[in-house]
Amino acid sequence: MTIDDELRDRIKRSAKKHALLNAVKHKSDAEVGAIMGPLMGENPEFRPHGDAIPGIVSGVVSQINDLSVDERRSRLETIAPEALTDIESEDTTDTYDLPSLPGVSDDEPTQSVRMRAAPNPNGPWHIGHARMPAVIGTYSNRYDGSFIIRFDDTDPETKRPDLDAYDDILEDVAYLGFEPDDVIRASDRLELYYARARELIDAGGAYTCSCSGEHFSKLKNAGEACPHREKSVNQTQTEFEAMIHGEYSAGEMVLRVRTDIEHKNPALRDWVAFRLIDTPHPRPQAADYRCWPMLDFQSGIDDHETGVTHIIRGIDLQDSAKRQRFVYDYFDWEYPEVVHWGHINVDEYDVSLSTSTLIEKIETGELDGWDDPRAPTLQSLRRRGIKGDAIVEAMINLGTSTTNVELSMSSIYSNNRQHIDAKADRYFFVRNGETFTLETASEDTIAGHPPLHPDNPERGERVVPVTDGITIEPADVPADGDRVWLKGYACVRRDDNHFRTTNDGIEVVREGDVDVIHWAPAPESSASISVRMRTPDGDITGIAEPDLTDAEIDDIVQFERVGFARIDTKDEQSLDTDMTVYWTHP
């Protein structure tokens, strides 16, 4: 259906208003996709011309985006003053998805906020790990505070650090869009922990104990003191120094914090602060140490020494704060504010969110590595083309409730789509296709010419040849004698193993008589591109159109009616494919 000059002018005028509204309201460039809905909703008479309107709107949007911020506001005030008034009268008070931190005012913060993420560096992060840096980094930005990464690597045996994980985790933090103000490795700070332990002993707050774990557990559960509890400060200091100098074997001696042996919670009764581990630490700087602090002691000391003001930890770790408060009371320190939250569960994956499980599956070959698309890791999401911002936004939306929360991967996909859709060029990719010959009406119809991007016609068109036949997905194959619309080409009718073009116009699609499908050159065609797509459900092979070779490695494209994908490698002759891509999401 032809658009006459009068209708074209009306479309441009309405598009100008909505483009200005979009740009002024969001304080950014207008986007064609963002204004098409309001434009068509306000002008239903435009709908019969839906295919042509984006091209007209695109030119208007480009003109608006060339204007300065002040010019956009001035023009909107001229053509739609009421709309400008509505925008400027909207509540401009900052709203946050996260609740305010305890003791901190959003209007006038009275203290400097300093928070930490304290990972165990035993491997790269899975998706659940992203929640802590996402929330802490967001709070840090909100309050102009500080964000610390502290590697709690003081267990060289049970939770043995992976030397590569330190850098892997920092890369994961950067991927999420944050840069820590400080990076601390607890294994560098043993002498500090020893010094604080000596002070605690002097204050009567700790004693050395050689009871077996089983024997002490029986005494503790009965609320009875172990005989070592009455040791003198001098004896305790002497035996603690012997622990430091390796004069005892693992399991022979520990240092306990003196709490309340009759406390109603047995887990808080005279807990272990230091123990002996014979296994050397993998970091050369810490390999000679054998006397290691337990996490509750090390973490409590570090939180004070580094000025942490607010701690976020799992609801299951409430006892940690209670244990540490005994040490803080001995030193007359003020304990940081604590926010407890529930566990996070992530849908869509068959592999559990467990670093040890992932390590096992990688070692046995079930997974190719940390960035295998089947792995629920940040490295995997990054390789698939998911932006860190999309993950952060999803994590922030979970809040900080004490109840367990379910993270739907669809929320990450939805966020990511907002980041990549406007930039992703479109291509055809056919999986497990069926091949047909195609009889063209003339030499002018030897190729399809779909746009690289429907909202950005200025990017140009692709060229998809049909002369050597086409391939389409099995679900799209019409019954013999039925028609389909080959997107970007024409309406065709099936005749056994052949297709013939018809004289039908686009109105058969608008009226719902004919389905629109994607397609690609036949596999035997010199124009076809063989593609391996790696997905969370396994690898898929298929055929893509020739212009896909124009995409660069790391580009994110959209395979129409299939989903987004990131270009990973090209010219992979060893795999008998022309290209490997990683599926991003629908």
Curated annotation (Swiss-Prot):
A motif ('HIGH' region) lies at residues 119-129. Keywords: Aminoacyl-tRNA synthetase, ATP-binding, Cytoplasm, Ligase, Nucleotide-binding, Protein biosynthesis. Its EC number is 6.1.1.17. Its main location: cytoplasm. One of its GO terms (molecular function) is ATP binding. Residues 84-111 are annotated as: Disordered. GO terms for cellular component: cytosol. Pfam families: tRNA-synt_1c, tRNA-synt_1c_C, tRNA-synt_1c_C2. It catalyses: tRNA(Glu) + L-glutamate + ATP = L-glutamyl-tRNA(Glu) + AMP + diphosphate. It is an enzyme of class 6 (ligase). GO terms for biological process: amide biosynthetic process; glutamyl-tRNA aminoacylation. Residues 85-94 have a biased composition (Acidic residues). It is found in: Cytoplasm. Belongs to the class-I aminoacyl-tRNA synthetase family. Glutamate--tRNA ligase type 2 subfamily. Catalyzes the attachment of glutamate to tRNA(Glu) in a two-step reaction: glutamate is first activated by ATP to form Glu-AMP and then transferred to the acceptor end of tRNA(Glu). This is Glutamate--tRNA ligase. The lineage of its organism: Archaea, Methanobacteriati, Methanobacteriota, Stenosarchaea group, Halobacteria.
